[in-house]
Amino acid sequence: MITSRETVLNPLAHRWAVLIGTARAYFVILNTYAIQRIRNPITLTINFATWRIAYGLTGHHQIAGASVSGFLLIGSFGNIIWFSTLWSSGFAIERARHEGTSAALFLSPASRPMVIVGYGLGALAMATPAFFVVAVVAVLSGAHFYLVDPLAAFLAFAGLVAGTLACGFALAGIFILSRRGNIIATLLQMPIYFLAGFVVPISRLPVWVQPFSNALPVTHAAIALRETALLGYTTAQAGPQILACFGVAAVYCIVGYFSLRRVEHVAKYAGQLDLY
């Protein structure tokens, strides 16, 4: 346990404790009911199988130079991470408001960005079985890998996680400020499959849609992960996409920071934390 003295002397340790504590607590909450443990693997496997069958029926054996199952596997990874982040980090403040704990969140010395990210990490930990189940199904259905540079693949996967967490952090404040967080979150679920290139290559989307795709960090991360894990790209070759992912993610972090500050400012000015 970190004492108040240690908190003052070691703020990094305090933030780390808040991050891990939040992630652990949210994981325990999600793991309470058995249905929560099997929902993600079943849902994501059905989603993968649906798209795999659809591509098979149209006679496609490759997508963007990669096997259909391999392409969809990377998209499923992105889908798992995005789905977990959207309903955890994105709804962190909204959940606290709904549960009546927003006062504790805003008045405590805990770092609110760490709380928001902690929710996302807890949800990702809960979704871990889904990664393995979908990966097994993908391999059995013909996924082929060509990994030359493990470091490049690791950086791409790290970018996928960081990019989705950055989106969740940005959405946390935006959902509150919009006063219609649930509606926005629901609207974002399906379009992201296409905008981020999870189920179809970005190059096949209409030209006017592609700028919106490039504005998402997960788009660049998914492309980089496919390049490194399926096409044998090295760090140098996939570097532009990896850098683009982290660069766009940084912009989302800035947006999240100012939107969170706005929520705090308005709440303090009004003298109540349940303003929204």
Predicted region positions:
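Hydrophobic transmembrane alpha-helices and immediately adjacent juxtamembrane helices
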Residues: 1-276
